[in-house]
Amino acid sequence: MDLQKPPNFMLDCGMAPHMMPPINWAAAAIAVASSTSGATNATSSNSVATSQQLQHHPYGTAAGGYKHAQQAIPKSVTPYSDATNCKKSSNHIKRPMNAFMVWSQMERRKICEHQPDMHNAEISKQLGSRWRSLTDEEKAPFVAEAERLRVCHMQEYPDYKYKPRKKPKKNPDGTLQQPAQPQAPQQQQAPPRGASPQARQRKRPNTDQQSETQQFQNFKSVKVEQDWMGNAHMSHAQKMPFHPSYPSPSEFGHAPLTPESGFYDDYFTQQHHQQHFASQHHNSAGSPLRMTNLGMDMGMPPQMMGHNSGFGAGNHPFYLHTSPPSVDQDDMRSLSSGSSGYADCSASEQSTSSPNSAGVVTMATAATTTTHLDDLEQICPTVTTGELVNYPWSDALGIDINFS
């Protein structure tokens, strides 16, 4: 073979003569090949060992790709984004990839190439089970790659701190609930430094309010007792306004049992006249006298007090009303109707007593007719006794006492 001429395969390939290498190109190529044969053998042996170590998974080439990228751009501003080929987002910073994520990234792509119809959840299950089945020696290269990516992530995001995002809760209708603000209660509990003592006192727990409520309840109970005791010492003038009501006939023993006798009308008519005479006792000489203050202080109505309750030392004498009332015809009608059991009761109910202004006994002398005298005899019967006793109230009642 003539070395001065170029080989025929170069001319056959259409290469121009001026682009052909010089004549001694073959010797130079042989010399370079002989000098670099040792280094080439060492490099090839290392690459073969690495390929044999990562032969069980297809991600070994990807890990090598990360290393080549790091060697190509050692002083990059975004080393993590360049190593992972991901876009940098200003809204959310992703966490650095761990060993499982480094391994599963290429493994997932491999599964998707062979089974494109497999669901993503099923792929994740298979990846998890296969990762757990690997030994620590098989996981070691991926753990080292994850540590290198973590350092790159720290250089790119020095102020990063992992904060897990909570999934928003869903309402029963399927809508998302608005997340609550956790800082609002803390601001209410802790007032600012420049706040006044009054503002801080308002934001304390409600223990003071509970104690005030208990004190207020105790105060109410004491107040009721004081009011009750104060009512016992009220003056007589405050208790004087008394409005008697007509009691039912069944409250007294002499009330009729049946309404056939017609005594109900007579009874209430007599009560009306008694109140009318008591209010005008100063203008009428024969009107009945009022009761003393003793019965009123005890809280007894005029109808409930007896005729003899005022007899005693220091009290005004009580007198029976002996003047003929304006219901004489009604009384006579009730007496003649056959209800003899109610005659004495109706006559005794006509009698009332009250002290006059001068405290002097005033007797009515209205017995001008025979009918009035008969009524007087019925109202004031004769009392018979066997002992000679001086009764100071005999003149006051106007009763004739016979001593046998």
UniProtKB/Swiss-Prot annotation:
- Where does this chain mainly localize? nucleus
Instruction: Please state what the protein is called.
Output: Transcription factor sem-2
Specify residue ranges for compositional bias: Polar residues: 207-218, 347-359
Q: For this UniProt entry, which segments traverse the membrane?
A: none
Protein's job: Probable transcription factor required for embryogenesis, vulval development and cell fate specification of the postembryonic mesoderm (also known as the M lineage). Specifically, required for the specification of sex myoblast cells and their development into the muscles that are necessary for egg-laying. In addition, may be involved in RME GABAergic motor neuron progenitor cell fate specification.
Pfam families, per database record: HMG_box (PF00505)
**What are the record's GO terms for cellular component?**
nucleus
Q: Would you kindly state one Gene Ontology biological process term found in this protein's UniProt entry?
A: negative regulation of transcription by RNA polymerase II
Report the superkingdom from the record. Eukaryota
Location of the protein in the cell: Nucleus
Query: Which SUPFAM superfamilies does UniProt cross-reference here?
Result: HMG-box
Write the record's keywords in alphabetical order, separated by commas. Developmental protein, DNA-binding, Nucleus, Transcription
Single Gene Ontology MF annotation: DNA-binding transcription activator activity, RNA polymerase II-specific
Q: Disrupted gene: resulting phenotype?
A: Embryonic lethal whereby embryos arrest at the three-fold stage of embryogenesis. Embryos initially develop normally until the late comma stage where a delay in the elongation process culminates in severe morphological defects. RNAi-mediated knockdown results in 98% egg-laying defective mutants with muscles lacking the egg-laying muscle specific protein egl-15. In addition, mutants also exhibit a multiple vulvae phenotype with animals having two or three vulvae. Double knockdown with let-381, sys-1, hlh-1 or fozi-1 results in no sex myoblast production.
What is the organism field in this record? Caenorhabditis elegans
Among SMART domains, the record links this protein to: HMG (SM00398)
Residue ranges for the region (Disordered) are 158-218, 321-359
Biased-composition ranges, Low complexity, are 177-199
Residue intervals annotated as DNA-binding region are 93-161
